[in-house]
């Protein structure tokens, strides 16, 4: 659909004079884009905030994340990276592209980067991790702390923490692979990381 025609977005633009920024290839889907964004572009907000655009395909093929460069770096990860999870690929996305985004971009960001996703699915995502990797101590510890949390005041995680309890970063875990092979017996004993990621995403679609 034409996302730019969303009534609430139109109202905000009308009331504030804000500019509509989107992925440079999203013009056919989003009406009225003022500026197309590419990897490396910088968005300035006020006098002190600068956000770097990351081109992060997978959830859709026109998805961007925003990275702030401060003493406490942050990643506004939209529907690409969730706390303890990864975005779906139902809207024209591709799990293989999402895997590449995780491995080639997100995993290489500083460990102290705080993660601010577009939705709060942390409770369900941690339950998925524990279904796939039952001995994950970090997920076991965090789950009771986030059950029923108010999304407006939710737990903020870092990328270093995500690598401890987010199944989509834990592609070499022996426990996770052993459990995965029960769902997909055709997998070899040591499947490659991309295959593990894609199969996890397939299972998460039905979770």
Annotated model-derived regions:
Residues 1-52, 72-73, 141, 145:
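Active-site HxH/HxHxD metal-binding segment of metal-dependent hydrolases
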């Amino acid at each position: 659909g034409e996302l730019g025609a969303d009534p609430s977005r139109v109202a905000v633009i009308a009331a504030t004079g804000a500019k509509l920024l989107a992925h440079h290839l999203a013009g056919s889907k989003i009406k009225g884009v003022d500026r197309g964004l590419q990897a490396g572009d910088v968005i300035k907000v006020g006098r002190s905030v600068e956000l770097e655009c990351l081109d992060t395909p997978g959830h859709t093929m026109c998805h961007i994340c925003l990275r702030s460069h401060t003493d406490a770096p942050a990643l506004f990860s939209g529907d690409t990276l969730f706390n303890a999870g990864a975005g779906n690929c139902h809207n024209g996305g591709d799990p293989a592209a999402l895997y590449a985004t995780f491995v080639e971009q997100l995993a290489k960001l500083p460990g102290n980067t705080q993660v601010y996703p577009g939705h709060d699915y942390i409770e369900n995502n941690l339950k998925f991790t524990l279904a796939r990797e039952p001995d994950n101590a970090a997920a076991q510890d965090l789950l009771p702390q986030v059950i029923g949390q108010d999304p407006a005041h939710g737990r903020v995680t870092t990328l270093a923490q995500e690598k401890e309890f987010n199944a989509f970063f834990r592609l070499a875990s022996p426990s996770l692979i052993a459990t995965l092979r029960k769902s997909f017996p055709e997998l070899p004993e040591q499947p490659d990381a991309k295959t593990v990621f894609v199969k996890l995403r397939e299972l998460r679609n039905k979770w």
